[in-house]
């Protein structure tokens, strides 16, 4: 946890939380409880988190509003953090009963001004009866009033912290099983699945590509401690079809596409499901290439129609042909997909790339176009030319109401952010599109925010020029970068 490897850890995975963890360096459960109470708008806006961290780390002395409050506030280094501490402070200083203290708690939580004024009088009088001077009593109540804007229930924070600790424990000691469960819980959210798979890679966990022979409905860990892909996470695949497929596979394995067509009701999935499985590579284990799998889909569906319409069907789907005849053999000469097409199809079916990166497809052609890979950047790099795939863009306005564009791009080695000022953006906006490979040139500097987020040195670029990569490649290589997919010309069935 102190190393901020908290992706998928309950409540602890946001960049801001990671930054607070780095500063606080929690060493015990109570500090995790405090961490969760501090990371909320009220404490963050008031600067309470800074005070807490500085006291914990010995940069600021730990003091208490009154010596009677040391047992109440020692756990939080003299900072009033929880509603329960306010209740106990009122009891210790002003003689409140538990019932009266709860009235004070509710008045704070609901910000009841009249009730708080009434409580001030009760509190100050109680403190005076306890030999505490009126001025000090009012100062302490002022602290309590300030706390009313951001007070949190300790029991809630403790419950969250317990879940945080449990998930961190599971991630540490049962990483494969924990990450498989996290992936299964993220089904339907391709961005989340993509980020978790990247985290698995960083952890040394191998997430396998979809496989019709081994993948389950959900993600799971195989005997080799690899994570098998959950087929219900594929885009465009009918969930009922995946469950049917899984049931059929328990009875018999699939030897090839013909065998698959004979044993599975392909009509239940339809064309869209079969295309998604093919593009994701799920048929790779029973078919020579993904292009062949895609070419076979119309015939697979035709056989499904025959099977569904034959009310007297009771046996081999191809019982009227020779046993060694495979009607899909006619597609064996279909050209395989090139690397770029393969990756594009993966993104269609999965929502991300799993077997490589588009920049890899042109790495030989761009070796003279770029000065660095992203992973090559270091403290001595003042400027660089990077070829990267645009992942996302966002804009803010400067003081003159002109756009400043932030672009995130990556290559086969890593990712980084670029800052594009308005003049350059106006000139190049037409090519700055997601999923486009561009050549970025600019000055390089440390990205403090992302460095804190990742606990490693990250860089960003102040972009000075942008070009479309295809304009720098020979025409014969442009097909590798085309946005649309190449259509297959397939032989007709005899």
Residue ranges and their predicted role:
Residues 1-488:
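Noncatalytic, beta-rich nucleic-acid-contacting surfaces in large DNA/RNA-processing enzymes
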Residues 489-494:
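A short, hydrophobic C-terminal helix/tail in secreted or cell-surface proteins
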């Amino acid at each position: 946890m102190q190393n901020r490897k908290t992706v998928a850890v309950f409540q602890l995975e946001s960049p801001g939380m990671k930054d607070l963890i780095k500063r606080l360096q929690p060493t015990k459960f109570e500090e995790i409880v405090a961490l969760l109470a501090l990371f909320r708008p009220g404490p963050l806006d008031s600067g309470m988190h800074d005070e807490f961290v500085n006291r914990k780390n010995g940069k600021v002395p730990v003091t208490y509003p009154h010596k009677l409050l040391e047992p109440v506030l020692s756990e939080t280094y003299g900072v009033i953090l929880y509603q329960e501490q306010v209740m106990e402070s009122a009891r210790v200083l002003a003689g409140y009963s538990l019932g009266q203290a709860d009235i004070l708690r509710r008045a704070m939580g609901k910000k009841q001004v009249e009730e708080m004024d009434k409580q001030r009088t009760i509190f100050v009088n109680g403190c005076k009866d306890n030999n505490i001077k009126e001025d000090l009593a009012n100062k302490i109540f002022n602290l309590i009033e300030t706390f009313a804007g951001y007070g949190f229930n300790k029991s809630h924070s403790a419950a969250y912290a317990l879940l945080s600790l449990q998930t961190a424990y599971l991630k540490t000691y049962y990483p494969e099983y924990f990450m498989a469960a996290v992936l299964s819980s993220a089904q339907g959210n391709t961005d989340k699945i993509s980020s978790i798979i990247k985290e698995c890679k960083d952890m040394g966990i191998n997430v396998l590509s979809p496989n019709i022979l081994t993948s389950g409905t959900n993600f799971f860990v195989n005997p080799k401690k690899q994570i098998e892909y959950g087929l219900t996470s594929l885009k465009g695949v009918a969930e009922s079809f995946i469950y049917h497929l899984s049931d059929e596979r328990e009875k018999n394995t699939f030897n090839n596409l013909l065998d698959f067509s004979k044993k599975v009701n392909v009509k239940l999935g339809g064309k869209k499901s079969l295309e998604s499985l093919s593009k994701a590579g799920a048929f790779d284990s029973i078919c020579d290439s993904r292009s062949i799998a895609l070419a076979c889909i119309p015939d697979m569906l035709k056989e499904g129609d025959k099977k569904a319409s034959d009310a007297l069907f009771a046996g081999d789907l191809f019982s009227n042909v020779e046993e060694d005849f495979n009607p899909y053999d006619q597609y064996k000469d279909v050209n395989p997909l090139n690397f770029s097409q393969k990756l594009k199809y993966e993104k269609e079916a999965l929502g991300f790339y799993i077997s490589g990166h588009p920049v890899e497809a042109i790495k030989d052609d761009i070796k003279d176009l770029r000065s660095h890979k992203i992973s090559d950047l270091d403290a001595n790099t003042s400027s660089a030319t990077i070829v990267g795939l645009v992942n996302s863009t966002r804009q803010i306005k400067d003081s003159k109401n002109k756009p400043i564009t932030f672009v995130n791009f990556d290559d086969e080695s890593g990712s980084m952010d670029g800052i594009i000022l308005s003049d350059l953006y106006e000139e190049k906006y037409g090519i700055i599109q997601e999923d486009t490979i561009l050549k970025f040139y600019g000055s390089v500097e440390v990205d403090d925010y992302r460095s804190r987020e990742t606990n490693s040195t990250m860089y960003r670029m102040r972009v000075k020029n942008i070009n479309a990569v295809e304009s720098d490649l020979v025409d014969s290589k442009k097909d590798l970068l085309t946005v649309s997919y190449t259509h297959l010309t397939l032989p007709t069935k005899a």
